[in-house]
Curated annotation (Swiss-Prot):
The keyword Kinase does not apply. It is found in: Plastid, Chloroplast thylakoid membrane. It comes from Piper cenocladum (Ant piper). F(1)F(0) ATP synthase produces ATP from ADP in the presence of a proton or sodium gradient. F-type ATPases consist of two structural domains, F(1) containing the extramembraneous catalytic core and F(0) containing the membrane proton channel, linked together by a central stalk and a peripheral stalk. During catalysis, ATP synthesis in the catalytic domain of F(1) is coupled via a rotary mechanism of the central stalk subunits to proton translocation. Component of the F(0) channel, it forms part of the peripheral stalk, linking F(1) to F(0). CDD domains: ATP-synt_Fo_b. This is ATP synthase subunit b, chloroplastic. One of its GO terms (molecular function) is proton-transporting ATP synthase activity, rotational mechanism. Coiled coil: none annotated. The lineage of its organism: Eukaryota, Viridiplantae, Streptophyta, Embryophyta, Tracheophyta. The chain crosses the membrane at residues 27-49. Signal peptide: none annotated. PANTHER family: ATP SYNTHASE SUBUNIT B, CHLOROPLASTIC (PTHR34264:SF3).
Amino acid sequence: MKNVTDSFVSLGHWPYAGSFGFNTDILATNPINLSVVLGVLIFFGKGVLSDLLDNRKQRILSTIRNSEELRGAAIEQLEKARTRLRKVEIEADEFRVNGYSEIEREKSNLINAASENLERLENYKNETIRFEQQKAINQVRQRVFQQALQGALGTLNSCLNKELHLRAISSNISILGAMKEIMD
């Protein structure tokens, strides 16, 4: 057992400055650690993220449907206003001599009110969609960050044990001893 431990300590030995060596300490190589963490994140986070995005998509679609219904109601109001406008125009032809300018004002007011109402509803729909999209993006970001953090902590906790700490400490002590001998 001591020979096995010594071989691992010698494999994890860091070369001195100015020399070339191959680092076989798996825990000290970042690309392997990063690929393991990313693999775990992708494997475990894929389903949760897709469910979250599907739920978000359904909420956004329902908001769009509600906005479309509001738009339909506004178009219906606009049609009613146009019908009323046609009625007013017929009455305007009959009473042109008595109140042409007032009828024109009423016509403009009706058109402006209907247009403003439609524009206001369209703006509300667009603001609602943007708000829901931003909210979905923020929730996804937060969820991914939490999952990444939990995965990294889980990986670290599963990799760290007492024997590994003792080997790292003894390796570092031998490196410091060798450096002290070189400096003396």
